């Protein structure tokens, strides 16, 4: 890959998320791990996704479900909104919006999540996330410019 990184940075893939996915570098911050996980979804790299889920999640059990999801989803972009510390130094949160098209719906949809990450030794892991609520009159996250109720919120 010699193109720009799918995570939305202005860097080449090999200078951005590639080294994390290849395992030659460790993500020093949760936002970096978030970006590399997004790239893994784009690349359909189930092994990296499973390796970066917190061990308590037992993500290996979801392998087939994750692979099945790859066949239905086309990713269109990632916006990292904020990275915030948690209650202790080994916890942090990353809020993001990921845009995608699902095979069942030709329209671009957006997923807005505040993901929680935990650190074990020097490695960060995704553990869970919450989806902030969006009002019906708020602008839709998919980027259409329409109100949520007239777009993805139908």
UniProtKB/Swiss-Prot annotation:
Pfam families: SEC-C, YchJ_M-like. Signal peptide: none annotated. Coiled coil: none annotated. NCBIfam families: PRK01617.1, PRK01752.1. PANTHER family: ADENYLATE CYCLASE-ASSOCIATED CAP C-TERMINAL DOMAIN-CONTAINING PROTEIN (PTHR33747:SF1), UPF0225 PROTEIN SCO1677 (PTHR33747). Belongs to the UPF0225 family. This is UPF0225 protein YPO2172/y2149/YP_1971. It comes from Yersinia pestis.
């Amino acid at each position: 890959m010699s193109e720009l990184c799918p995570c939305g940075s202005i860097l080449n893939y090999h200078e951005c998320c590639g080294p994390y996915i290849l395992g030659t570098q460790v993500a020093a911050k949760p936002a970096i791990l978030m970006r590399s996980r997004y790239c893994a979804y784009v690349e359909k790299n189930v092994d990296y996704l499973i390796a970066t889920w917190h061990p308590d999640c037992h993500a290996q059990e979801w392998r087939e479900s994750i692979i099945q999801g790859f066949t239905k989803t086309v990713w269109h972009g990632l916006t990292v909104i904020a990275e915030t510390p948690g209650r202790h130094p080994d916890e942090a949160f990353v809020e993001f919006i990921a845009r995608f098209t699902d095979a069942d719906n030709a329209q671009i949809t957006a997923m807005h999540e505040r993901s929680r990450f935990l650190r074990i030794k020097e490695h960060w892991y995704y553990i869970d996330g919450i989806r902030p609520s969006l009002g019906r009159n708020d602008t839709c996250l998919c980027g259409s410019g329409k109100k949520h109720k007239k777009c993805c919120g139908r």
